[in-house]
Amino acid sequence: MELRAKALREMSDEELNEKLSSLKESLLRERSSVAMGGAPSSPGKMRSIRRQIARVLTVMEEKKR
């Protein structure tokens, strides 16, 4: 599921922190499966997760200002 910045801006700080932690966990699972010699569930999934994490962090920084 692709996260849009508009939807992220409507979330509270607590929701953003929860989303960030869940995204980091899913990235960790993908990386560990690749490290154990398995193939990722889809080739672009890790890239997508990294970009979603960046979006969440960007919105969190915007809210600090």
From Swiss-Prot:
Belongs to the universal ribosomal protein uL29 family. GO terms for cellular component: cytosolic large ribosomal subunit. It holds the Pfam family Ribosomal_L29. It comes from Picrophilus torridus (strain ATCC 700027 / DSM 9790 / JCM 10055 / NBRC 100828 / KAW 2/3). One of its GO terms (biological process) is translation. It comes from the Archaea. This is Large ribosomal subunit protein uL29. InterPro entries: Ribosomal_protein_uL29, Ribosomal_uL29, Ribosomal_uL29_CS, Ribosomal_uL29_sf. The gene is rpl29. Gene3D superfamilies: 1.10.287.310. Keywords: Ribonucleoprotein, Ribosomal protein. Residues 30-49 are annotated as: Disordered. One of its GO terms (molecular function) is structural constituent of ribosome. The keyword Ribosomal protein applies. The keyword Transit peptide does not apply.
